[in-house]
């Protein structure tokens, strides 16, 4: 986890089965769950049926989910996110006719996609504040153990980092230091609200989807990692996505260049906690944990195996997942969501 599941009703409290989904996967005490990307403000949204964390109704619904996870003796972080240029302009207008479609620069996330307007400095500051408020709502009101800033997969923080989406000529774009400025200010604002030991960030240096895939991400992500380590000795973790995962697609080994690894982040960040995600099996996960000391995140396998932790411990084969049921916006049936079987 985290995995986008689009089962939430955007303008109403979360569906009750969302609680079942998380509680099912928290049944082994000590499990750490990270929610799917949860939007920090209406202006930061982008498509229907994603979870949100700004109204009292939403906070109350999340509190019930958090309490259910904690009752199992497990932990849960909220991944907080903003869409930026990936948002649907029509969806934003359907929520409020004044909501703009914006990004770091006036560049679309894909050929033929709508072109966002370049964010003003006022809008940049506004989004930084959104992240701070979202973190406070999650930790201080809903009771989450911490938050993970979504800085991966072409969402807003990632858009500022990458030269393919950020060609600004002010202090928020251009050099490595300038492209890292917005992510660092988001981190600073979130840390101010909840403390560094309750904050992590997810990064995908090698992701090519959603118009990402800068030619050489190593200098940018090295600088970000170094600065976070220097500024926040108690920062909870960095969560990296392997090069083999490209958005929602798995690349073939021959499509991945030899240098496309996250070892550069791992080496800078050591000995602090690093979470690694990217289609791990039981065997490859254990091998990476043993050889590199990473914490291993499981996403898709956790969808189809609510008792994944037990299966990992006892070497029980994984149940296969059904991709066709990954994303069913607003569905309340539980199909492909809460109906996967536990091993006997």
Label each region the model flagged.
Residues 1-344:
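Flavin-dependent oxidoreductase catalytic cores
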């Amino acid at each position: 986890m985290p995995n986008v599941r689009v089962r939430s009703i955007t303008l109403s409290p979360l569906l009750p089965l969302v609680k079942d989904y998380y509680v099912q996967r928290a049944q082994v005490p000590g499990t750490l769950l990270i929610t799917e990307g949860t939007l920090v403000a209406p202006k930061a949204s982008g498509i229907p049926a994603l979870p949100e964390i700004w109204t009292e109704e939403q906070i109350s619904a999340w509190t019930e989910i958090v309490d259910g996870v904690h009752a199992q003796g497990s932990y849960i972080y909220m991944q907080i996110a903003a869409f930026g240029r990936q948002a649907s302009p029509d969806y934003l207008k359907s929520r409020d006719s004044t909501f703009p479609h914006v990004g770091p620069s006036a560049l679309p996330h894909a050929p033929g996609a709508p072109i966002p307007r370049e964010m003003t400095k006022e809008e940049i500051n506004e989004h930084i504040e959104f992240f701070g408020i979202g973190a406070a709502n999650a930790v201080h009101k809903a009771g989450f153990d911490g938050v993970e800033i979504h800085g991966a997969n072409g969402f807003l923080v990632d858009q500022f980092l990458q030269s393919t989406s950020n060609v600004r000529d002010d202090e928020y774009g251009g050099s490595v230091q300038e492209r890292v400025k917005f992510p660092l200010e988001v981190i600073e604002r979130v840390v101010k609200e909840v403390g560094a030991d309750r904050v992590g960030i997810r990064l995908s240096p090698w992701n090519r989807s959603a118009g990402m895939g800068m030619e050489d991400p190593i200098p940018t992500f090295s600088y970000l990692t170094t600065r976070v380590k220097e500024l926040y000795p108690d920062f909870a973790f960095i969560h990296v996505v392997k090069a083999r995962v490209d958005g929602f697609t798995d690349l073939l080994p021959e499509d991945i260049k030899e240098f496309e690894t996250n070892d550069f982040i791992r080496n800078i960040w050591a000995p602090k906690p690093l979470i690694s995600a990217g289609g791990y099996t039981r065997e490859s996960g254990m091998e990476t944990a043993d050889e590199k000391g990473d914490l291993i995140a499981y996403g898709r396998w956790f969808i189809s195996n609510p008792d994944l932790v037990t299966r990992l411990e006892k070497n029980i084969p994984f149940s296969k997942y059904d991709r066709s049921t990954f994303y069913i916006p607003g569905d309340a049936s539980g199909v492909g969501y809460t109906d996967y079987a536990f091993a006997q």
